[in-house]
Amino acid sequence: MTRGLELLIAQTILQGFDAQYGRFLEVTSGAQQRFEQADWHAVQQAMKQRIHLYDHHVGLVVEQLRCITEGKSTDVDFLLRVKQQYTQLLPDYPRFEIAESFFNSVYCRLFDHRSLTPERLFIFSSQPERPFRTLPRPLAKDFFPERGWSHLLGKVLSDLPLRLAWQNKARDIGYIIASLQEALGEELLATCHLQVANELFYRNKAAWLVGKLVMPMATLPFLLPIHRSDEGELFVDTCLTTHAEASIVFGFARSYFMVYAPLPGALVEWLREILPGKTTAELYMAIGCQKHAKTESYREYLHYITRCDEQFIEAPGIRGMVMLVFTLPGFDRVFKVIKDRFAPQKEVTAAHVRACYQLVKEHDRVGRMADTQEFENFVLDKRQIAPGLLALLQAEAGNKLTDLGDRIVISHLYIERRMVPLNLWLEQVNGQALRDAVEEYGNAIRQLAAANIFPGDMLFKNFGVTRHGRVVFYDYDEICYMTEVNFRQIPPPRYPEDELASEPWYSVSPGDVFPEEFRHWLCADPRIGPLFEEMHADLLRADYWRELQTRIKNGHVEDVYAYRRKQRFSVRYGADSRPDKVFTPPSGRVRRSA
């Protein structure tokens, strides 16, 4: 093969990435129109479409390269020269970091995830020190309260690109000021100014204004979820100003934002200040660059594994019937491998399990299903695997292992954020913490169901608790769409003996679910049962689930809030939330700073 071929291949890959990201931005740019037109089904379709774009364009490039090389095999030296040529194209390229991930994806598709070495791939960035702070145009605009906070906020809201009328802008400004006063106090607020991102962040049925509350000694998040009323008018639903609240909004269990980001690396750096607890991978994930997030996630893993003296161990909790789960004690992720054989009661296949994980990737996760990264041919050093875990892997997933002497290769696994299994959490807490956990658990089931997801296996062990106390579902092998389930009420027994029989006295078909039976395992614990019955008794009735199904089949898309209901302005300020009401903060207008 000629020397010029390496450059042609490198240019072809980069042009393929340009095409992919151009389509990514095109789909993203439609978010405003979808929001304004309340086309919520189009929102869901666009989310799936944008996820599929990446693999589609990788496939197109792979076919081009096979034509260019006429299907001939390539030697190691040739591949190294291709990477060198590609690297030389990147110093002036604005999205170099994601272009590196795209190169990796093309390589993996061409060579079936074999020979994944730093020499052939961008395992590490070619430009780790390249800053994103020098930009052709600012990512955000500063607003100062020289004429008071009412005027400042009026300017912020008026500058938004949304073309709908406001339901009551003066009322919402009053709410925001009252919320800021409660959070900071008037004196501190008077020393602050706002920095607001130029682009809105769209997700579900909200357009999020994302900003920074800049104080003399610190910077806080400033997040406003803007909603559209049924009458087509805009209103602000709440104001969030803590790092914990912002972390939940940008959480790993939520769908990706639609935010127009020609320079995603710069946006990630800008967000980092208000999301200090988020890793680089999580920030790229939040803005929809999920494939590059996978690259960053792997880099974070390598950074940890090369500096720790820990061994992989089986993850705490009840051992699963489908997945073998392991972790590093100090690492915040778990590794999940599909077993070779499932427990007899699990009538699913490995292909079905993988399809379920893909469904979760593409579906609206409503803050209640953990996102995952999928890896092939994942290499582990044997000396970093506890003997008990290694024996378990060989026994339960031996068909997915390749022994390389001092290392093993796992042909397929998922990496997911680690949480405390809910069953362990419930054993450890009491009082209000127990009540909160039971409430969260029921709310998770409700919100999943409203999003057309039936969890299937709702045992506590299949849910986890995040560091913010939220309950998240993470066992996907039995999930299905709500519309595929036949919810039934158990018919009354024909004779007294029926209730004592080992077999049911009624017919059961595939897809039948009897919510009354949930009580047997959800309410068996005397500490938990009364709380569940108090807060979530309707989940034990078939008619509750059938009513939800009817709403879904009629096209209803439920509102999803990334904050508690009590934080909504309509709840906090109650009677003052009428559309025609002008709300005045308790202490009047915030005074201007000197």
Curated annotation (Swiss-Prot):
One Pfam assignment: AceK_regulatory
GO MF entries: [isocitrate dehydrogenase (NADP+)] kinase activity; AMP binding; ATP binding; phosphoprotein phosphatase activity; protein serine/threonine kinase activity
Reaction(s) this enzyme catalyzes, per UniProt: L-seryl-[isocitrate dehydrogenase] + ATP = O-phospho-L-seryl-[isocitrate dehydrogenase] + ADP + H(+)
EC numbers: 2.7.11.5, 3.1.3.-
Disulfide feature: none
Annotated residues for binding of ATP: 315-321, 336
Catalytic residue list: 371
Subcellular location: Cytoplasm
Keywords attached to this entry: ATP-binding, Cytoplasm, Glyoxylate bypass, Hydrolase, Kinase, Nucleotide-binding, Protein phosphatase, Serine/threonine-protein kinase, Transferase, Tricarboxylic acid cycle
Cellular component GO terms, alphabetical: cytoplasm
Family annotation (InterPro entries): AceK_kinase, AceK_regulatory, Isocitrate_DH_AceK
Principal localisation: cytoplasm
Superkingdom: Bacteria
BP terms from Gene Ontology: glucose metabolic process; glyoxylate cycle; tricarboxylic acid cycle
Role, per record: Bifunctional enzyme which can phosphorylate or dephosphorylate isocitrate dehydrogenase (IDH) on a specific serine residue. This is a regulatory mechanism which enables bacteria to bypass the Krebs cycle via the glyoxylate shunt in response to the source of carbon. When bacteria are grown on glucose, IDH is fully active and unphosphorylated, but when grown on acetate or ethanol, the activity of IDH declines drastically concomitant with its phosphorylation.
Family of this protein: Belongs to the AceK family.
Name of the molecule in the record: Isocitrate dehydrogenase kinase/phosphatase
Organism: Klebsiella pneumoniae (strain 342)
